Amino acid sequence: MSLSIAGMSWITPLGSGVADVWKRLVAGEAAPVETLENEQNGARYLVRRVPATLTAHLPAHPRLRRASAISRFAAAAGLAALAEAKTPPSLDRVALVFAISNGGVIYTRRFYADIVKSGAQSASPMLFPETVFNAPASHLAAILGISGASYTVVGDGAVGILALKLAEDLIASSDLDACLVVAAEEIDPLVCEAYRQWRFLRDPKKPETGRGMIMSEGAGAVLLERSNGGSEIDQIVPGANFFRRSEASARLGSVVARLENEIGFCIGSANGTFIDRAERAAVGDELPLYSPKIALGESVGASVFWQLITAAKALETGTLPGSSKPPVNSHALVLACGLNQQTGGLTLRGRDRSAFPGSA
């Protein structure tokens, strides 16, 4: 089943306007890198953060009064994606699907830190609701007035593929007019420390090297409808898990094999880890391959949506960042590989089934 993208938005460390961030990516810009310090052990991490100004315009809603950064990112992206739709859907016929990986870590860490320091009696009833994975989806549904189906899908950097597949199933099997699919993540030293111990992070003493990933935060959102022209997701393949890093390229290769259909370029999930080599091996040396994570950072749960929006803009504008020779075939491949063994992918085609204006 093909799905039309009626609206899309992102909140990134490089900005929030889809067109503006896209221009900066094409120009070769990258989001600023900051150093985040862990007060517990003194460790330092390279991160890319979302400027506070990008969520300053949010409506004055009770749900946002004490909401963590992840919920504010999600609200900003979701509202913007809905606003982009030419014909706004009736909210009572819209489902919400939320993709997430680390969740509301800032408030979760504070909640359990108080318990560890002062005992269970110090647990904050205000912080506790923010510790569950579906808190951001709950906030967003309340802010938008969506009272129907609301789902939260938890996974790694490929979780966005699973969320999009769920949205496809919901639209195909119900009376829904549309599905708003949102993903968001926030940065906290606790998350960075976990990835540091797994040896995935870039060495803060060697920021210029391309080895290791730089954590980031933000959100992405797409409003999906039944096929009606415009940019369309043709096929979604959740993919298979891998249990060793050496298996990653084979699992990604099987995803590519199921999606091959006039693919002109690939928007991948390379982030400075083993994923870079696995993806290149899966798609081969000839296919143009670009990863927005190199410029925006590793946003984990939100990353697939940044990749999807990047692919849509590449199809629309006939430009691929970092490539002097634009591809000419009609489909973009979005390939996702997470650090916790998930893979997946999808194909996207442009408005007129021709990837780039003037191409044969």
Predicted regions and their residues:
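Conserved "HGTGT" condensation-loop signature of ketosynthase/thiolase-family condensing enzymes
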Residues: 1-149, 161, 169-172, 184, ...
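Internal active-site segments that recognize and position negatively charged phosphoryl groups
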Residues: 166
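Alpha-to-beta junction loops
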Residues: 175-177
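Catalytic nucleophile serine of serine hydrolases
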Residues: 157-159
